Structures are given as C-alpha cells and as structure tokens.
Amino acid sequence: MSDFIDRALITVKAGDGGDGMATFRREKYVPRGGPDGGDGGRGGSVYLEVSPHLNTLLPFRFETHFEADKGLNAGRQRKRGRTGEDTFIRVPPGTIVSAEIEGEVQTVDLLFPGQKLLVARGGKGGLGNTHFATASNQVPRIAELGQPGEERELQLELKVIADVGLVGFPNAGKSTLLSMVSAARPKIANYPFTTLSPNLGVAEFNDFTFVVADIPGLIEGASRGVGLGHDFLRHIERTRILVHVLDAAGTEGRDPFEDFLTINAELKAYSSELAQRPQLVALNKTDIPDAEAFDELMRPQIIAWGIDPENIFPISAATNQGLQPLQRRIVDILREMPERITRLPYSEEILTFRFSNIDPNDFWLETEEDGVLRVHGEKIERLVSMTNFAQSESLERLQRVLEAMGVSAALFAAGVRHGDPVRIEKAELLWQDESIG
C-alpha cells in the first residue's frame, strides 16, 4: 500500500479576471463610431472534489500549490474575453478542510464522492469602455483591469472512513488480521509501532463487502496525545464497529485483560460516544500454548466488564483460525445498521465557505505599524484592484467614488493631509488637496 498521509497544507489561487478594453469603432462609413471595447473574461475558480478512488493525502506531499486559469483579456468590437477554466483538486472521502475566511477559521467536512467545495473564487472580468459612455463623455478612454482571483491557504486533515476499526496495543496482531481478511498488505514485523498510520482494506464475506481500518497501536495516555495518540484516535471516530485485538498469549509480557481495560479507558477519555460503539473482542495468538490459560482467565472478566459473550472470538490471525465466525458477526452487525460506508451515495452538491453579509459599501480605517492609514472595505478594495492607474479617466473615476462613499472625508477627519500616503488593497496612494489622486 502507498504511504498514508493524513495532513497537508496547500495554497490555492483562483484565476484573475481578464482586462477590459478601451477601443473605438474605426469603420469607413461610421464617422462617430463610439466605444467598442469588450469585457474581460472571468477567472477560473478552484474546487476540491471528493474522489472515491483516493484514501490518502499523499499527492499533496509533492504538490502544494494549485492555480486556476486566468480569464482572457477583452477584444475590440465588444468581444468578451474567454472565461478561465476551473481547477478541480481531488481529495479522499473524509477530508476536513479548514481555512481562514474574513478573520474566522471555518471547517468543511467532505464525505461523499462527487461532492465539491468552492475554495477560491475567480476574479470578475474588467469592464470595457462601452460601459462608461455618457451624454457628457461619449468617447470614454477608460476600462477596468480584471479583478484578482482569491488566494488562500487550506489545511487538509483526513479522518479515515471505515466500517470496522481494529484497535489494540502495539504488536497485538492487528495488521496480520487485516492482511488475512482483505487484500491489504500492511507492513508486519515483530516489534511495537510497526504501523504508524492507518491501513485500509476491503473485506468480503458472504457476498457482503466492508472496509476495515488497521489503527496504529494505542498505549496508555493516548487520549492525552502520548505515543501519537491523538493522531491515531481520531481515525477511529468514523468507524462503526470496533474490533479490539488482544494478545491473548501475553507474548509482550503484559496482562491481556489490563491491556483491554487500558484501551477502553483511553477510548472513553477521548470520546464518550466512541466508547459506546459496538465492540467485538478478538483474542488473538491462540495458536500459542499460553493463550488457552489466558483465555480461560480473561473471558469471564471481559464478560463481567460488559462485552456480550457472542462478541468474543478466539482467533489466530497468523494461521487464519477462527476468522470466519468473527467476520460473520461483523457482517451481521453491519447489516442491521442503516448506512454502509462502502455505499456512500454519490453527491453533486457544491459547498461553499460562509461569507458575511456586510454591506459592500461599508469601509473602515486601520493604522498600520508604520503609521500609514489603510482603508478596508469590499467595494473600495475591489475598485482599486481593478483601476488602471495609467488612465487619467480611471483615476478621476476612483476619486469620484472615494468622495461619494465618504472615504475622502473619513481620511481627512483621521488627520490625513496633502502628500500623506494611504493604502487600499495593494496600492499606496497619495492624498492631494483633500482627496486622493
């Protein structure tokens, strides 16, 4: 099986919008042709898309930056630029996406194959000069730049989705059990912590398929993070049945029943809901002579603790002994459950992050560390990012909007005077004569 990676940090950049054009009709029989500059195309957006064929975030170890196509610039004769193509990034089911949106960290859980999450919106195309013609200005020499596409950092975290989670102390035989009931081939060796990340396998019994996750070995203190406990325990959260694998022969020199109590205490400390999940007990390594004595001693204790006698199975994962009754019981329990992980419904749902309902005309001022005032606000930031400062009419338009919105008055009231710098978006402007030019 390929390396299992369950955390990744990536950056995504949507495409910038294409620039609008400031051109005029130049035709023989049209003496007053007027403006004919087209609009720029919208930039492509970036989506995460759930793929049922992935079960790890390994691809993001090698590629961490993703961009969508830019919108094309406009043409003459009102020709609109082509829209940039969207980018789709495939992620496995069970991926949790976290991002900072408007100063708040938001998380979205992607579970269903086909489900999409819009993570970066493409920029709008800039308007051509046809939009700026007025009765008093019939030859506008002004066009907008394309709006920059959104860019953000995403934290990806995978919690495996499986029907059955194999839990137990290191070296209890979980990986061997997984390899015997499925086609998975996890690393197996006779020392603790051979498994450092979950292994997944698809098992089939009596024409019923189910997904099994071999969870790395837990130890005392796992619920507090000891021995990578938090990294391991979170992968159990989305399993529906727990199979507790015990070294019934005590080959590691520990008391198997004490191991049983310790693991269950850690499960309860991590999540009370997790501790209530259906649990089967597999008394493993029964092919070793000492196991029979431990079995006779442990079975009454495990039953007294609360495990149904029907849910206790002596097995030998190494020799395939006793595995069929265990699998039969797993299938019986899963058949009674309303949902099967292996049959997650396909979804065409497109999810988005939550954005505030702040009035786009609102703005506020912030003094930065060097004492320069910065203007924040959706509309004003978008306008500045789409202003072509090489066009005098664009500067005049910006000045009119600043004054109409009350930004100029607010800056003057805040103490800005002639020649002082003011920052809006990525631009640094100079205050001139009680206005910004």
UniProtKB/Swiss-Prot annotation:
The keyword Repeat does not apply. Residues 355-433 form the OCT domain. Residues 162-335 form the OBG-type G domain. CDD domains: Obg. One of its GO terms (molecular function) is GTPase activity. InterPro entries: G_OBG (IPR031167), GTP-bd (IPR006073), GTP-bd_Obg/CgtA (IPR014100), GTP-bd_prot_GTP1/OBG_C_sf (IPR036346), GTP1-OBG_CS (IPR006074), GTP1_OBG_dom (IPR006169), GTP1_OBG_dom_sf (IPR036726), OBG_GTPase (IPR045086). It is found in: Cytoplasm. GO terms for biological process: ribosome biogenesis. One of its GO terms (cellular component) is cytoplasm. Pfam families: DUF1967, GTP1_OBG, MMR_HSR1. It is an enzyme of class 3 (hydrolase). Keywords: Cytoplasm, GTP-binding, Hydrolase, Magnesium, Metal-binding, Nucleotide-binding. Its cofactor is Mg(2+). The keyword GTP-binding applies. An essential GTPase which binds GTP, GDP and possibly (p)ppGpp with moderate affinity, with high nucleotide exchange rates and a fairly low GTP hydrolysis rate. Plays a role in control of the cell cycle, stress response, ribosome biogenesis and in those bacteria that undergo differentiation, in morphogenesis control. Belongs to the TRAFAC class OBG-HflX-like GTPase superfamily. OBG GTPase family. Monomer. PANTHER family: DEVELOPMENTALLY REGULATED GTP-BINDING PROTEIN-RELATED (PTHR11702), MITOCHONDRIAL RIBOSOME-ASSOCIATED GTPASE 2 (PTHR11702:SF31). NCBIfam families: Obg_CgtA, Obg_CgtA_exten, PRK12296.1, PRK12297.1, PRK12299.1. This is GTPase Obg. It comes from Herpetosiphon aurantiacus (strain ATCC 23779 / DSM 785 / 114-95).
